[in-house]
Structures are given as structure tokens and as C-alpha cells.
């Protein structure tokens, strides 16, 4: 299948035995590195406009998390071979394995969206000095704000067995997000590209496991890592940050944006009343040149 606007050649790396991650490595090998991390239920396709707008000068690294996009989608049953546990810590470890493989030990720009924030800032806990610039879009690096209720659409998948069945049977989360996660309707071919990797029950495993891994309390497996990321977030206030936010997002809404503003008061912010969760779909014509200008104003 071809994907509109995605004229790139993915590469593959076994991040653990028998489990391969698909990723992009676009742009000059000696260019300033921009690591772009997607969330759920998207994949690296989310970043295509930014890759196209930066890769003449910048080295763009764009992984598809395991179970997502063009990466392998292993089972997590106890007897599965190979087996993957679909936890936040495993996502962080996978990212570290990829960047080690690519020899990226110098300064980077960390660009994040959705779960990409928790993965990226989780990785940054042990690579703080490498992260020199931040590009933050509709994401989190701290627990659910107390004033923010969990959207029922997310709670359904996280808490209810019926929700898991519905998501895995009908691709409800990926398909729904392609309609409801934008303010400007996606062209049909773009919408198909977003949902194509999740074309059967087996291939939808990660879209539900991400939801079930959302840390809401200390009893949850990912809580400790997220809490440490939250504690470390203000320590990034000494370096350039760019925040782009779609204010119509039902999940990562104004409460999450406010959390980032408090932690990173130096950040340049572009918040859009008429943009949604996939802010790079709704506003890529504005954001791609704005992000490039931000990088050029703040060279590594």
C-alpha cells in the first residue's frame, strides 16, 4: 500500500529477538538530529509533513512503536513466541536501543505527540543532557491533572472488557480518531493511511494495550516512570521549547497545555482554538515552517 505524502523508505531493526521496529532515518547523516515520537492510535505517518519540511537539513528519526504502524505486532500471551509486554518501560527501552544502533549519542531535538511524550520524557530521564530542544504537541509527561476527567472513550478501552472487544473487532479507536481527532476532515486516502496498519484483530493489539497501560495511580505499572518524568520536566526550562496545541482535543486539552506552560515557562506556544488532537494534520501549513524557524533560531 502507498501512503499519501509518505515518500520515505522505512528501515527495520530488531529491538529484541524476533521483534522488528520500523523507523525512518531521513536527511543528512551529519544533520542536527530531530527524534519524532508518535502516540496511540497513530504511527510515524503523523510526522510526514514535518519530515518533508526538515529533512533537507535535519536528520529526522521517526520510529513506529512496536505494535504500531509498520513495526511488528507480536502477541503478549504468556506462551507467545516472540512475546512483547506492551509497557511504557519497554517503549523507552526500544527507543534507547534504536538510538544506540544509529550511533546517536550527541544533542537531539525531541518532538513528541500523545504517548510520545511519556516515552520521550521517560527516555530523557537518563539522557537529559542530550535533549537540547523540545517540540511538544498534544501530549503528556505528567499524570492526569486532577481537574481533568478521563474521557469516556478512553475509559471504555482502559477499563471495560467490552471496550477491548469493540476496539479490536471494529478498529474503533484508530478509525474513530481519524474522524474525531481532527477539525479539518482528513482526505479519504489519508484516513486510510492512518488506519491501514490496524487491519485485523491481531494487528490492533497495541491500540488497546496502550490504553490499558495509562497510569492513573501508584498501583499502575507505568506510574513510577511517569511520576519521575513529571518531577524532571521543569529541569528542561533552561532550553528552547516549542509547544503546538489543538484546543479541541478531548483528551490532551487545556489542562495538559497548562501543565506544560507551568513547567516550561520559556516555551514558545501556538495554541489553536480550531485544531484538534492531530494538530499536525489540522495546522501543518502553519506549524511546519514555524517549527523550522524555531530550530533555526535555536541552533544546537
Swiss-Prot record:
Ranges of residues in domain AB hydrolase-1: 33-282
Keyword set includes Lyase: yes
A Pfam family it matches: Abhydrolase_1
GO cellular component: cytoplasm; membrane
Subunit structure: Homotetramer. Forms a complex with OleC and OleD.
Function: Involved in olefin biosynthesis. Catalyzes the elimination of carbon dioxide from beta-lactones to form the final olefin product.
Assigned protein family: Belongs to the AB hydrolase superfamily.
Protein name in the entry: Cis-3-alkyl-4-alkyloxetan-2-one decarboxylase
Source organism of the structure: Xanthomonas campestris pv. campestris (strain ATCC 33913 / DSM 3586 / NCPPB 528 / LMG 568 / P 25)
Gene: oleB
Amino acid at each position: 500500500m502507498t501512503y499519501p505524502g509518505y515518500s520515505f523508505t522505512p528501515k527495520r531493526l530488531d529491538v529484541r529477538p524476533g521483534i522488528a521496529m520500523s523507523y525512518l532515518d531521513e536527511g543528512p547523516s551529519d544533520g542536527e538530529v530531530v527524534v519524532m515520537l508518535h502516540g496511540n492510535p497513530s504511527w510515524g505517518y503523523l510526522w510526514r509533513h514535518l519530515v518533508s519540511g526538515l529533512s533537507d537539513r535535519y536528520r529526522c528519526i521517526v520510529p513506529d512503536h512496536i505494535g504500531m504502524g509498520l513495526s511488528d505486532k507480536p502477541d503478549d500471551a504468556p506462551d507467545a513466541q516472540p512475546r512483547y509486554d506492551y509497557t511504557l518501560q519497554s517503549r523507552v527501552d526500544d527507543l534507547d536501543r534504536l538510538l544506540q544502533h544509529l550511533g546517536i549519542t550527541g544533542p537531539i531535538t525531541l518532538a513528541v505527540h500523545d504517548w510520545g511524550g511519556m516515552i520521550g520524557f521517560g527516555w530523557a530521564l537518563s539522557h537529559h543532557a542530550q535533549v537540547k530542544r523540545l517540540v511538544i504537541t498534544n501530549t503528556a509527561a505528567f499524570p492526569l491533572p486532577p481537574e481533568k476527567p478521563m474521557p469516556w472513550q478512553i475509559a471504555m478501552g482502559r477499563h471495560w472488557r467490552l471496550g477491548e472487544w469493540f476496539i479490536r473487532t471494529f478498529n474503533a479507536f484508530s478509525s474513530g480518531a481519524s474522524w474525531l481527532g481532527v477539525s479539518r476532515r482528513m482526505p479519504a486516502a489519508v484516513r486510510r493511511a492512518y488506519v491501514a496498519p490496524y487491519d485485523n484483530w491481531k494487528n490492533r493489539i497495541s491500540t488497546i494495550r496502550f490504553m490499558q497501560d495509562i497510569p492513573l495511580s501508584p498501583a499502575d505499572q507505568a506510574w513510577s516512570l511517569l511520576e519521575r518524568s513529571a518531577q524532571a520536566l521543569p529541569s528542561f526550562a533552561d532550553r528552547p521549547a516549542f509547544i503546538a496545541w489543538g484546543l479541541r482535543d478531548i483528551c490532551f486539552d487545556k489542562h495538559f497545555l497548562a501543565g506544560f506552560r507551568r513547567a516550561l515557562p520559556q516555551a514558545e506556544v501556538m495554541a489553536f482554538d480550531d485544531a484538534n488532537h492531530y494538530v499536525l494534520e489540522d495546522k501543518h501549513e502553519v506549524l511546519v515552517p514555524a517549527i523550522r524557524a524555531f530550530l533555526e533560531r535555536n541552533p544546537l
